[in-house]
Design a protein with these regions (language model features):
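Sec/Tat signal peptide C-region and signal peptidase I cleavage site
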Residues: 23-27
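Bacterial N-terminal signal peptides
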Residues: 12-22
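Short active-site loop at a secondary-structure junction
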Residues: 68-88, 92
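Residue-level preference for non-acidic, small/hydrophobic
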Residues: 63, 82-89, 152, 184, ...
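A short, well-structured edge-of-sheet supersecondary motif
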Residues: 44-69
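Small-residue-rich helix-loop
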Residues: 65-69, 129, 328-448
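Conserved serine DD-peptidase/penicillin-binding transpeptidase domain
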Residues: 28-43, 92-360, 445
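Bacterial N-terminal signal peptides that target proteins for export
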Residues: 2-12
Length: 448
């Protein structure tokens, strides 16, 4: 969808949260000094004061906002923060950037037998999954390789940083949205399990096995109950045991679980072994290891991810937290060199914004996804970012990444019957006690 440059746009940003900081810069007086009556009435009916809301609405190119309410108060933007991460990624990495995954060796490759130390090094590809892995392994088979033996060493050193408790945000460490970044990310760390009953037999299976993962099935037969719960126990090293408990009656449908319980390297190793032997009829006798790739290796194959432009709608439109975290560390590595860390990522984002004339003194960014209680930015500065991006060189990619009102992404079920349907391009944000939305709306006479 190409957005024509000559159409008048309205830009809006609104974030609801408890304030923490406020800026003191002088702002232009809004054309409408008060919030519209409809908004005030809605706030009143919800039991919320106008003090708890910030709003900023401005016509693109206009020196004055239409509405400015608590616009300089620093709020928690929730997932609206992904706009900053995406904007800086476009400016630093570029829309055509693709993340490599390298297969190298300092062993031998003779007669189709790849032996010795074989290294798989990741550079933070957000989208590397089973489908991409299968494609990569197919390329090896096409090169005549039929046997992998020795040691398969997984290199995730391109990212680093302090160990983060994935449950620190909300006490749910195994929820897929809390999955932490990894330079060798695989399937967004997601492991999928299915509990099913056929007759008197109850089974628990996984489509994403890992050689360090053990499944314990304690589900019992029942006449009515369909309740199944899980518990996770970590053992020595990287061993993980998941216990499924509860009851399944004959009438129960299959119960599906998606969890972030294993690290990408272990899951990838098991997937490689399965695909190589079961699907590609190859031979596999390689031990699992994790380590850094040495200098004296030769390239066997390089796989490339989809481009940033292709991935950005998943980050923004669908509000993918894992990919946003990957982007932030990639930005940090690009600006300050490897390894990519949260600190480098946050500093790189702030540095790039300043170079674009976007000085946000209240900005606090933790992980690039907005899944944070620490993050802060004002609605006025979100609007300044939107204006800058609209006039920037990547406007079409930027706008295509946003959720269209009433049509797709996080806006698919919102504003479906309003005049804004199909004409609004938004990024939404939701946390406990936080609701936010920012983006663009075509004027009544606008066309797309």
């Amino acid at each position: 969808m190409k957005i024509r440059a000559n159409l008048k746009k309205l830009m809006c940003a609104a974030v609801v949260a408890l304030p923490l900081l406020s800026t003191v810069t002088q702002a232009a007086e809004p054309i409408y000094p008060n919030l519209p009556a409809e908004i005030q009435n809605r706030l009143k009916s919800s039991g919320m004061s106008t003090w708890g809301m910030s709003a900023y609405v401005q016509a693109i190119g206009s020196p004055r906002p239409l509405i400015s309410h608590n616009a300089q108060v620093a709020r928690n933007p929730a997932s609206v923060m992904k706009l900053l991460t995406s904007y800086v990624a476009l400016g630093t990495l570029g829309p055509n950037y693709r993340w490599p995954i390298e297969i190298t060796t300092n062993g031998s490759l003779q007669g189709g037998v790849l032996s010795g130390n074989v290294y798989i090094k990741g550079y933070g590809a957000p989208d590397f999954d089973t489908k991409a892995l299968r494609e990569m392994l197919n390329q090896l088979r096409r090169k005549g390789i039929h046997t992998i033996q020795g040691r398969l060493i997984f290199d995730d050193t391109f990212f680093n940083g302090p160990k983060i408790d994935p449950g620190a945000f909300d006490g749910k460490p195994y929820s897929s949205y809390n999955a932490q970044p990894d330079a060798l990310m695989f399937n967004e760390r997601r492991s999928q399990f299915t509990a099913a009953r056929k007759g008197n037999r109850i089974s628990v299976t996984t489509s994403t096995p890992a050689h360090n993962l053990r499944i314990v099935n304690k589900i019992k037969r029942a006449k009515r109950s369909c309740r199944v719960s899980t518990s996770v126990k970590r053992g020595r090293g990287d061993a993980v045991t998941i216990t499924f408990s509860g009851y399944l009656a004959r009438r129960c449908r299959n119960r599906g679980f998606t969890m972030a319980v294993t690290d990408p390297a272990n899951t990838m190793y098991s997937a490689i072994k399965k695909i190589w032997t079961k699907e590609l009829n190859g031979r596999f006798n390689a031990q699992f290891m994790v380590g850094a790739t040495p200098a004296n290796v030769r390239m066997i194959h390089t796989h490339y991810s989809k481009s940033l432009a292709e991935l950005l709608p998943t980050v923004v439109k669908d509000s993918n937290n894992v990919m946003a975290r990957q982007l932030m560390r990639s930005i940090g590595a690009k600006r300050f060199g490897a390894p990519g860390t949260p600190k480098k990522g946050a500093e790189a984002i702030d540095d790039y914004l300043r170079k674009q004339g976007l000085n946000f003194p209240e900005l606090r960014i933790e992980n690039g996804s907005g899944l944070s209680r620490y993050a802060r930015i004002s609605t006025e500065n979100i609007s300044h970012l939107l204006s800058k991006a609209y006039y920037g060189p990547h406007r079409d990619v930027w706008l295509r990444s946003m959720a269209v009102a009433g049509v797709d992404g996080t806006m698919k079920g919102r504003l479906r019957t309003s005049a804004v349907r199909g004409r609004g391009f938004f990024k939404t944000g939701t946390l406990r006690d936080v609701r936010g939305i920012a983006g663009y709306v075509n004027a009544a006479d606008g066309r797309t």
